[in-house]
A protein has these predicted regions:
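C-terminal/peripheral segments of proteins
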Residues: 1-215
Length: 215
């Protein structure tokens, strides 16, 4: 099992690494931050790496050996947490899944409605990759609640070559086919044409809404 330093959503090694990384931040926090301050302070990843590259006496009388033992213990604890979370079969430890890294967009009314209505309002879950330390930041939690939901790549030489991504759709009406029509593209890190000229727009027109004043 080889980890290629990519948090691919279809990767089991990526799932193991993220469990280790999360455990690492917890353990370094427990080691370095006084107990009375642990609700207020956390050690960031850059500082964590610096502490591991130049270990001090907090790791024990032999800091290098203590650091190595600390990392091995952290890995074992991370794997144990994954086993408890996803079961003993390592094939089930794939990173991108509903029980691990995913994107579920919860409607503001989601908690107040029936399960049937909630299924209409919420969008997802869709498997995701990455985390808060990767390009295309997808956040540090299991459910992606941070990161870009909209991106646009504008070609100022030819505006009709502009590309975009957005989520979850183009309508706020859950009964509309456009309510979540862009979500899968976004979750797959794919883009769509964002046409500019009238001819191009009308060539892919879904519907026209005409609003006429009553008087």
């Amino acid at each position: 099992m080889l980890f290629r330093s990519v948090l691919d959503r279809d990767s089991v090694p990526a799932g193991i690494y993220v469990a280790f990384e999360r455990q690492l931040l917890d353990n370094i926090n427990a080691l370095k931050v006084p107990a009375e301050a642990q609700d207020l302070l956390t050690v960031g990843m850059k500082t964590t790496i610096d502490m591991l590259l130049a270990p001090d006496g907090d790791f024990g009388p032999d800091p290098l050996a203590g650091r190595d033992a600390f990392l091995l213990r952290t890995l074992a604890e991370g794997v144990l947490s994954l086993r408890e979370k996803l079961g003993p079969n390592t094939d089930d430890w794939v990173y991108g899944q509903a029980d691990y890294k995913h994107a579920l967009i919860r409607h503001p009314l989601s908690a107040a409605v029936s399960e049937e209505v909630r299924a209409q309002l919420d969008v997802g879950p869709a498997p995701r990759g990455g985390n808060s330390f990767t390009l295309g930041n997808t956040g540090s939690g299991d459910n992606q609640t941070t990161g870009a939901s909209f991106r646009i790549f504008v070609d100022t030489r030819d505006w009709d070559n502009t590309l975009g991504m957005n989520a979850p759709g183009q309508s706020g009406d859950p009964n509309s086919p456009l309510y979540d029509n862009l979500f899968e593209l976004w979750a797959d890190d794919q883009v769509f044409p964002a046409f500019y000229s009238r001819d191009k727009i009308e060539s892919v027109l879904f519907e026209t809404l005409e609003l006429t004043p009553a008087n």
